[in-house]
């Protein structure tokens, strides 16, 4: 039986993400002044490109694998089979990615300027094959991530100060990231196998491809969802200078510092909690969602408001006066934490837990096709401001469509009395005091 570890996991993931971001915050003022906007542009362009391979290798298993295991956590045979299917599938996806990456190096002109950075980042993708997040997430045991990331962040900070001395030393940053990711993920993978007595069962190829095929809708939804960030950067590369990309990606990366610290811990921790609630009954799961909706909306609205108000102070303090142009961009996208939080709540937490994978996929596909077409026009016409507006537009369109289809399906996730601060406090206390999930 599980103890309710939702808030414990949110806290642990929050500490983990703070560690991931706090140490870069310390190094950012130093690094930004050495490598400048152009160096940041090179790093961020390569990172955005390699990000597609990360999505491909991770596939949808942090969602589908977590949901399957958390709903059958007591069935040891099922857990081992699901665990093995994920790992073998990722191995196949990594081999396919290797072929695609080599082709992109030969034919992708944009990568020729910084192919060393791209190669370093791609080598690090072996860590994605053994990424154990879905395992720890399924067992609602995420405390270890905070400890590991504190140690990694401190060592990485020291190495950056020691090795990054000139504007040509920017390649050390992805190098350190690659090395740490490989060792940490493989180590956590081995530890999870021992702790939960997991067995890696050999999977036939037809079974592996069957798993990949069955999860295609969630995977494609994740990929096209990534268009909201990475594709903006890729498209901008056709219309603006590397220096201007540096301005845009600085604001985007700072935004996702906020998202990683506040958004990811909450969404990651509540997903298995909601999924387990739906395993009891649809009614129980729906009631849990209704209680969580107002809590997340208030929290993300306050976070976005703070980001809007304090953007000038934060950008100037961290990056220096050379990045003043990033302030207006960050203010334009300040409410993305709120819109992104609503997209995740309606799509991942609700539609996927109701098993509407195809609907989730179709909504994301439509919104991102519209956003992709519009992004070319806006980026060409308005530069990085156009890309920023497009980011907001896709989120808002997704939210509207999710609400529309939930209404058609007669799924009501809004209970207005739960928006009362007094009721929110009561619901928080009841969740914290809950001793068991089943």
Where are these regions (language model features)?
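Interhelical loop/hinge segments that connect adjacent transmembrane helices in multipass membrane
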Residues: 1-6, 143-146, 170-177, 186-229, ...
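Signature of the first transmembrane helix
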Residues: 4-62, 157, 216-243, 253, ...
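Membrane-water interface segments that mark the loop-to-transmembrane alpha-helix transition
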Residues: 8-20, 46, 51, 55-105, ...
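Hydrophobic alpha-helical transmembrane segments
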Residues: 45, 115, 122, 146-196, ...
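Transmembrane helix-bundle signature of multi-pass secondary active exporters and lipid flippases
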Residues: 47-55, 225, 248-268, 272, ...
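Helix-loop junctions and terminal segments of transmembrane helices
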Residues: 58-74, 251, 255-282, 286, ...
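Interfacial segments at transmembrane-helix termini and the short loops linking adjacent helices
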Residues: 104-121, 309-339, 385
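Membrane-interface junctions at transmembrane-helix termini in multi-pass inner-membrane proteins
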Residues: 115, 125-149, 335-363
């Amino acid at each position: 039986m599980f103890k309710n570890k939702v808030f414990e996991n949110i806290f642990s993931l929050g500490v983990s993400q703070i560690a991931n971001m706090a140490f870069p915050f310390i190094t950012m003022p130093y690094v930004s002044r050495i490598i400048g906007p152009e160096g940041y542009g090179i790093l961020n362009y390569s990172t955005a490109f390699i990000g597609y391979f990360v999505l491909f290798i991770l596939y949808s298993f942090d969602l589908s694998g977590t949901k399957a295991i958390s709903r059958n956590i007591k069935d040891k045979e099922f857990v081992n089979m699901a665990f093995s299917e994920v790992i073998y599938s990722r191995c196949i996806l990594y081999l396919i990615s290797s072929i695609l990456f080599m082709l992109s190096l030969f034919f992708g002109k944009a990568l020729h300027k910084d192919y060393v950075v791209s190669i370093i980042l791609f080598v690090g993708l072996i860590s994605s094959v053994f990424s154990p997040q879905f395992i720890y997430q399924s067992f609602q045991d995420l405390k270890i991530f905070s400890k590991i990331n504190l140690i990694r962040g401190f060592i990485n900070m020291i190495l950056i100060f020691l090795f990054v001395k000139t504007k040509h030393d920017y390649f050390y940053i992805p190098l350190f990231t690659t090395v740490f990711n490989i060792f940490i993920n493989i180590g956590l993978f081995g530890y999870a196998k021992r702790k939960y007595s997991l067995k890696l069962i050999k999977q036939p190829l037809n079974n592996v491809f069957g798993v990949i095929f069955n999860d295609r809708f969630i995977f494609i939804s994740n990929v096209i969802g990534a268009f909201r960030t990475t594709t903006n950067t890729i498209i901008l590369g056709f219309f603006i200078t590397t220096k201007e990309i540096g301005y845009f990606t600085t604001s985007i990366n700072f935004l996702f510092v906020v998202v990683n610290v506040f958004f990811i811990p909450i969404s990651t921790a509540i997903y298995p909690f909601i999924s387990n609630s739906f395993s009891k009954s649809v009614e129980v799961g729906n009631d849990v969602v209704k209680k969580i909706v107002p809590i997340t909306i208030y929290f993300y609205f306050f976070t976005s408001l703070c980001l809007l108000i304090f953007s000038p102070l934060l950008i100037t303090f961290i990056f220096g006066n050379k990045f003043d142009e990033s302030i207006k961009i960050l203010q334009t996208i300040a409410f993305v934490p709120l819109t992104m939080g609503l997209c995740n709540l309606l799509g991942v937490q609700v539609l996927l837990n109701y098993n509407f994978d195809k609907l989730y996929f179709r909504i994301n596909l439509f919104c991102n096709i519209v956003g992709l077409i519009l992004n070319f026009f806006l980026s060409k016409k308005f530069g990085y401001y156009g890309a920023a507006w497009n980011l907001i537009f896709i989120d808002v369109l997704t939210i509207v469509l999710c609400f529309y289809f939930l209404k058609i399906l007669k799924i009501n996730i809004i209970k207005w009395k739960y928006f009362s601060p007094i009721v929110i406090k009561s619901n928080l206390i009841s969740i914290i005091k809950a001793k068991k999930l089943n």
